[in-house]
Amino acid sequence: MQTTLGPRVRTRFAPSPTGYLHVGGLRTALYNYLYAKKVGGDFIVRIEDTDQARKVEGADQSLLKTLEESGIVADESILHGGNFGPYMQSERLDTYAQYCRQLLDQNNAYYCFSTAEELDENRKLQMKQGIQPKYNRKWLPETMGGNMPQSEIQKKLDEGAPYVIRMKVPDYISIMFEDIVRGPVEFDSATVDDQVLMKSDGFPTYHFASVIDDHLMEITHIIRGEEWLSSMPKHLLLYEFFGWEAPRFAHLPLLLNPDRSKLSKRQGDVAVEDFIAKGYSPDAILNFVALLGWNEGEGSEQEIYSLEELVQKFSLERVGKAGAVFNIDKLDWIEKQYIKARPVDQIIQAIKPLLQKELAEKSTDMDVARISSDEYLTQVIDLMRERVNFENEFITFSNYFYFDPETYDEAAVAKRWQDDTNEVLAEFITELEESDDFSADNIEAMLKAFVAPKGKKPAFLIHPLRILSSGVGFGPSLYHMLEVLGKQTVIRRLKKGIERVTV
């Protein structure tokens, strides 16, 4: 069967609006986008909402929003329009009915009046007999090689009995195609069921509508998950029934858990929106999913890619057949690299709304104008960039830069406090109050000079100073942290702390 089309590449991502965007869906969308953009082609997003029972209101807009937040902007969609619309399948029902009528007239499809109970009974019987469940063709008309008289079919139609329309799969033929990822693939039509094309509610099935739309929208390459490979015989037969040239197909490897089981929505958070809500950035997520099945090739150690680099370097020939393991540790590492490299102004733009929300919900003893300033936030970012895992942690994990601690790490206090700690701290607070230089270097020099005559090591004060200033026993360089917090804030916190912490 011929599977090549004209020179302009057109790919599509066709999600169902049944919920959030699965990470596997993001990968499919990305690979379609990259393949089209690399050669100057078009990327289309089509909403496949033929299953009205599972349709979630607003999910179509949410899917497109998530894609665009990740940098994947469609050339044609329900948002952007285009010359091949509508891009919502529920708005194309007349088109599907027209092509279904053509298949009926050609004896490539037939009416089926079997009830759900009959179908279930037939399926159970076949399974008991060890036969692969398939429709038993009870309603296949005599004119198509079946046993049902046309008069019986017409009688049911006249009575207004509910029906579906099924395709007639040819008997005992070989169905072959060349998959871009998997190479030659062959099916025996004897294993293929007479697929339902039109449901009793007048809506087409995915299999029928997608073939019609892919042809009418001039899609040249269909890049989708491996789970659709078993549907290929039905799709290729439909192209043949209509006399249409089929696009080229590429079936991507499954996404797997570390234990090699299939990554599933039922196993927890696998929606892109869930990862974004946890603090992962869209560009890091996109980079991560790009590597789930694709690699640049031997000799390349690069793992961090911009979208522009991916467009330049991506090829379906470098997509593997084996399942791709979804390793959350790898995503964490990629996110960390993005935070390290992200310009300060971008981080400030992202975290300012979070800080403003915190300040609106909670009072602070610090100067709000100062801690909200770009200058102050830049200092916090420079100090914490190596320590945070997500952008929002510049606020949440670094809370003590904006609010005085309400509690102190009890384990750290128990470990670091001695009988005379508060007494020595009080003396050092006086030293700090009298100093006009609150730079990190001077604070360090003062501390070392202060403890030496007392026969103590710097650590005697370093840890208590950190705990009383931040509430926790770990963090960035103490001296730089104190400098960023500022003299007024540090002295206030230390005085408050020695009143509250006792051994």
From Swiss-Prot:
Entry-linked SUPFAM superfamilies: An anticodon-binding domain of class I aminoacyl-tRNA synthetases (SSF48163), Nucleotidylyl transferase (SSF52374)
Per UniProt, where does ATP bind?
A: 265
Question: Transmembrane region positions?
Answer: none
Motif location ('KMSKS' region)? Answer: 262-266
Identify the keywords attached in UniProt to this record, alphabetized.
Answer: Aminoacyl-tRNA synthetase, ATP-binding, Cytoplasm, Ligase, Nucleotide-binding, Protein biosynthesis
Catalytic activity entry: tRNA(Glu) + L-glutamate + ATP = L-glutamyl-tRNA(Glu) + AMP + diphosphate
A cellular component term from Gene Ontology for this protein is:
cytoplasm
Q: Which InterPro entries match?
A: aa-tRNA-synth_I_cd-bd, aa-tRNA-synth_I_codon-bd_sub2, aa-tRNA-synth_I_CS, aa_tRNA-synth_I_cd-bd_sf, Glu-tRNA-ligase_bac/mito, Glu-tRNA-synth_I_codon-bd_sub1, Glu/Gln-tRNA-synth, Glu/Gln-tRNA-synth_Ib_cat-dom
Q: Which domain of life is it from?
A: Bacteria
Q: Does the keyword Ligase apply?
A: yes
One of the GO biological process terms: glutamyl-tRNA aminoacylation
Gene Ontology MF terms in the entry = ATP binding; glutamate-tRNA ligase activity; tRNA binding; zinc ion binding
Q: Where on this chain is 'HIGH' region (motif)?
A: 15-25
What are the EC numbers? 6.1.1.17
Q: Where in the cell is it found?
A: Cytoplasm
Is ATP-binding a UniProt keyword of this protein?
A: yes
Q: So what family is this one in?
A: Belongs to the class-I aminoacyl-tRNA synthetase family. Glutamate--tRNA ligase type 1 subfamily.
Q: Which NCBIfam families match?
A: gltX_bact
PANTHER family listed in its UniProt record: GLUTAMATE--TRNA LIGASE (PTHR43311), GLUTAMATE--TRNA LIGASE, MITOCHONDRIAL-RELATED (PTHR43311:SF2)
> What is the annotated quaternary arrangement, including any partners?
Monomer.
Q: What does this protein do?
A: Catalyzes the attachment of glutamate to tRNA(Glu) in a two-step reaction: glutamate is first activated by ATP to form Glu-AMP and then transferred to the acceptor end of tRNA(Glu).
- What is the protein name stated in its UniProt record? Glutamate--tRNA ligase
* Upper lineage: Bacteria, Pseudomonadati, Chlorobiota, Chlorobiia, Chlorobiales
GN (gene name):
gltX
